[in-house]
Curated annotation (Swiss-Prot):
This is 2-oxoglutarate dehydrogenase E1 component. It is an enzyme of class 1 (oxidoreductase). Pfam families: 2-oxogl_dehyd_N, E1_dh, OxoGdeHyase_C, Transket_pyr. Its EC number is 1.2.4.2. Coiled coil: none annotated. Residues 77-125 form the RPE1 insert domain. The lineage of its organism: Bacteria, Pseudomonadati, Pseudomonadota, Alphaproteobacteria, Rickettsiales. It comes from Rickettsia felis (strain ATCC VR-1525 / URRWXCal2).
Amino acid sequence: MEEDLKKTGYLFGGNAVFVDELYRQYLANPASVDQTWQEFFAGIKDNSTVLNKSTAKIIIPYEIKKEPLNNNLSSEVLNNRHLAKPAYREEFKGDTERSTAAYIDIREDASTGSTSKLPLEAKFGKMSSLKAKEMINTYRKHAHYLANLDPLGLELRKTKNDLKLNIETFGLDNSQLEKNINITDEFVGNWNCKLSELVTKLDKTYTGSIGVEFEQIENVEEKNWLYNKLESEVTFSSEDKKTILNDLVEVEGFEQYLHTKFPGAKRFSVEGGDASIVAMSKAIDLSMNQGVEEIVIGMAHRGRLNTLTKVVGKPYKAVIAGFISGSVFPDELNVSGDVKYHLGYSSDRTIDNKKIHLSLADNPSHLEAVNPIVAGKVRAKQDILGDTKRSKVKAILVHGDAAFCGQGVVAESLSMSPLAAYDIGGILHFVINNQLGFTANAADTRASRYSTEFAKIIAAPILHVNGDDIEAVLKATNIAVEYRQKFGKDVVVEIICYRKYGHNEGDEPMYTQGKMYNIIKSKPTPGNIYANELVKSGIIDNNYFAKLKEEFKAKLDKEFEQAKNYKPEAHFLGGLWQGISRIRTQAAITGVGKKTLQDLGTKLCEIPKDFAVNPKLVKLFEARKATLTSDQPIDWATAEQLAFASLLSEGTNIRLTGQDCGRGTFSHRHSVLHNQIDDTTYIPLNNLSKTQAKYEVADSNLSEYAVLGFEYGYSLANPKNLVLWEAQFGDFANGAQIIFDQFISSSETKWLRMSGLVVLLPHAFEGQGPEHSSARLERFLQLAAEDNMYVTYPTTPASIFHLLRRQILDDTRKPLIIMSPKSLLRHKYAVSKLDELGENTTFLPVLDEVNKVDTNNITKVILCSGKVYYDLFEMRGNNSNIAIIRLEQLYPFEKKLVASLLKKYNRTQEFIWCQEEPKNMGAWRYIVSHLNDVLKEAGINNEFKYVGREESASPAVGSLQAHNKQQEKLLKEALGM
């Protein structure tokens, strides 16, 4: 209880109802409250005034908050909640947020009719110290509204009177300014100074160039640590200040150099937000000193060229060459490349014999899309290093103000960041608030005062800082870096600055922000402001500043000359990616010995005797085991588990995430078993042997965009891991369309970034309506080109087994899109023999007619893909005049293989492509030209006819009856029935 009292501190007003209720309990029965409270209340009761137990009431200063007070909360929780005001208030002086009455009010005594008001000072020690505690706490909570954050001075700043932060609000006056304050308190810290000195200190700390929001943090230790750090002085030596100035000179100098040499060229200058580059560089140095070995940075286009050079270490000549020649990669690679301000880079930085690896992630213009990719890449690197404390590899994300509060992926990424499967030990966020979103003012882009409200979802500390005060920016950065490393959580530094030019250098901002840009035009740069400060303090003279600029320009002139003959380099396929090829040289043999498969399968079906698994699963596992040992055909789930188990036993780590993927949306996988008694779990795939690799499976939060982005990022770090994301239904994958369009399908040709990510998308038309039928197969086929990925619609367990193993055993890495089954998971014909998974077997992209037929008697050949095959197969029955061929892989289209099969049917009169999807969806529009080409190559003078659903705006009908009619119609039409 003593600790609770300490945390409750000076009995701030939010606890009034809580303390009053305790006091009433004490009056009724002193033994009903803790001993410490008994002693506390005894001090009140022992007063000479007689108390009437039915009417005595304690009045304590309070604050008005939005949430209702929960009187059952512990004092620790109360100390961290936003609390409601008490239901009553005995005295309220003025329209303020807190009562100025600081006394214990003893109501009228029934026996004497007298009343008495006892000064609180008499019962709580020195009154001024008590009031000072309240003042400190109030400054901490609300003084950010008074902070000088806007370098343009456009904001009308509030005053102390506006916020009731003058000393009179706390029952103090000027006569007490020289009175000594002596506070020893766990929450507000230790203070021993004059009241005037306290006020000065609080003003300097909380109403200067830094404003903080820490009250959303529930952990008292974290909050105290942050306030104490902020209240501590940070000093910079003369040499430190010169280094800072030099950094500012280089940031501004490079932007101006490009502006002069390439007028009008887009570069998305950082000018106005120069401090952000210096802060990022400082954060890296600080992180290195704290044991960080690698940092991955994600950011948008603004300030990227300066980040590439000043922060990450890309040669200036390499960036300048991009302006001169336009080439970013060697011509012989024959890739599309991307604009300069989207490209990433990697390098090593060494300071004081300490080395840190830096990576700037490639990104598109889609703002904030890179956030989960960076997080996933960091998690993968941490796993490679065995960095379970998440302290050796970290992420830095740089956001724009309008994007941070406008893009939904920010909230998705923040929400998932504390979850076990996605935790990377916190991210250092810099929000570069230049007070504009292209042409939109802040009032048009958000309803909140700050752009950082999303960060409160995870109770991240937020430090707002004036971008013109470089030393304040560095102090905030220092606190943020230390916090992330100490507590392993996200932290946000918002740098309020401005944008010197328009959205790009060719844009005219005066059309829409005339007032702002009139101020900006006459405003000294951050570098000039800081140089003037150093001149005034006698650290440098004007010649020193001029010389710094001249020397840096001379350096850039040399880099410019070298850039004229610079040949771009391709930084990829190094490190863990050595041995991986861009071009697939041969088909991998993916089969596994039959005995090995049976042994692995048996092991997968073993459940510990003391593990209380659901009885239905016991039967399921027994049936699987019997299937394997008796050499019966296996189903899809068993084949998938065998693929995983064989890879794990060969040393390949596997990571599978997605909504409900542990069990499987359709209750087929059951790779995580749950104890029915104590909720513990057992994962058979992690209990194969002592030498096996790791199987990580996690049910994700309800997100597609951020989760798929995270897994894509994870796949970039290590090609030797099998990384999978499974959609709950394929229909929901388009919630992550940006990841598919901007990253998965195009990252290799834009940025030379390869990925072996596997995407499982349940897809089939089964009468479940327009939202549970289609993974939009057509969209993936539209994205497919230049051997950028595999798009498959497999129909057999053998196919999924080989596809999964091929992702690792191939000598290249391409994303694999799988239209995965739903009803086929339990279809009696959707099975494979173990021999089809056995030694010297491989994935077959095309499956010929399964029955033995006389090709001379075949009058019709139907090509199809996916579940519709089984519908056709069952309806065809014993008709031996129709051959059905399956395409298990749609892209890349195996032209030669298909042509060789069709040659067998050169006497066939009719060729049909059959699909379940509407004509404007599915594979038809992609595949029709390919199919007719292979007919010609096979020497067959014919064309493929379409059979399927008619064109439709919606993927499927909502009625099961209507679905069944459509399905029967297309099947009969295809079969000629």
